[in-house]
Design a protein with these regions (language model features):
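Catalytic active-site module of serine/aspartate enzymes centered on a nucleophile-bearing elbow/loop
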Residues: 284-314
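Conserved hydrolase catalytic core segment
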Residues: 102-141
């Protein structure tokens, strides 16, 4: 297993009041005068974890983590009000200004890559470079593959558990059926749907099964925010004007350095999307990890991400 940088604690942390009722948790670790990097977590609704600080050389990087609206330590928990891609882009810009950072490196995987691309295309002059993993651009075909008809061919056993909470008559549109339950008035049904939705992703994220992640994703507090916020974004197509908005917007960031790390056997965000992004952005560096799935903490993915962040140290 490649070695992450040693565990470290934040030297600064706090809450940033954004649009009511939301308050965003943020923290800094590493070198206070170093190269700023912001870790953009997945989901949406996944939140941050202390282990995420460890992809960066703490002697070189000023490491910023934050929990997006409604998840992690941000409040209110699992809140969908005023929770869109463009609200999160605005939150990142407010946080950058709050911390007095001129330009920063964006580091994001899965939904984190979506938000990184959206932010960079909106504020290209505020970005030094991008490190992206498990590319997700929220096109309809990507959602259809994972949540309706595609990944089910590789994980029929896990998929059977995922669809079990939805009556057969509603299975023609599973995202919408889940959304109705996750936003309904029955807290028992909400939680049952949240756990099934979240465990489906946990069971498909690794090349080899990872029981600790399955357990963590099934925990009530995590699952409720993760599933509610994801379904909210997905029924709204990510709040993008067009299906291919992020790929179409690459011209605005083509001049920026970018490393794309992609697991060859990523079932959650298949390599086709990373390939499409790289084709649109020939100056990007695509690193395909031959023995990995989707998760950031698989050995080959860790190695490639560390090489990318070490490569940008100068």
């Amino acid at each position: 297993m490649p070695e992450l940088y040693p565990p470290l604690e934040p030297h600064a942390q706090g809450y940033l009041a954004v649009d009511a009722p939301h308050r965003i948790y943020w923290e800094e670790s590493g070198n206070p005068r170093g190269l700023p990097v912001v870790f953009i977590h997945g989901g949406p609704g996944g939140g941050t974890h202390p282990r995420m600080r460890r992809f960066f050389d703490p002697a070189v990087y000023r490491i910023v983590l934050f929990d997006q609206r409604g998840c992690g330590r941000s409040t209110p928990h699992a809140c969908l009000e005023g929770n869109t891609t463009w609200d999160l882009v605005a939150d990142m810009e407010r946080l950058r200004e709050h911390l007095g950072i001129a330009r920063w490196v964006l580091f994001g995987g899965s939904w984190g890559s979506t938000l990184a691309l959206a932010y960079a295309q909106t504020h290209p002059t505020r970005v030094k470079a991008l490190v992206l993993r498990g590319i997700f651009t929220l096109r309809q075909r990507e959602l259809q593959w994972f949540y309706q008809d595609g990944a089910s061919f590789l994980f029929p056993d896990a998929f059977e558990e995922y669809v079990a909470v939805i009556p057969p008559a509603e299975r023609g549109d599973l995202i919408s059926a889940y959304y109705r339950r996750l936003t309904g008035d029955d807290p028992v049904e909400q939680l049952r749907a949240a756990r099934a939705w979240s465990i489906w992703e946990a069971k498909t994220s690794h090349l080899l099964p990872e029981e600790t992640q399955i357990t963590a994703f099934g925990e009530d507090t995590f699952a409720l925010a993760f599933a509610r916020i994801e379904a909210h974004y997905f029924v709204n197509r990510g709040f993008f004007a067009t299906d291919d908005a992020l790929l179409a917007g690459v011209d605005r960031i083509r001049h920026l350095p970018c490393v794309i790390v992609q697991g060859r056997y990523d079932v959650v965000c298949p390599m086709e999307t990373a390939w499409a992004l790289h084709r649109r952005w020939p100056g990007s560096k695509l690193v395909v990890v031959p023995d990995a799935g989707h998760a950031a903490f698989e050995p080959g993915i860790i190695k490639a991400l560390l090489e990318a962040t070490d490569g940008f140290r100068s």
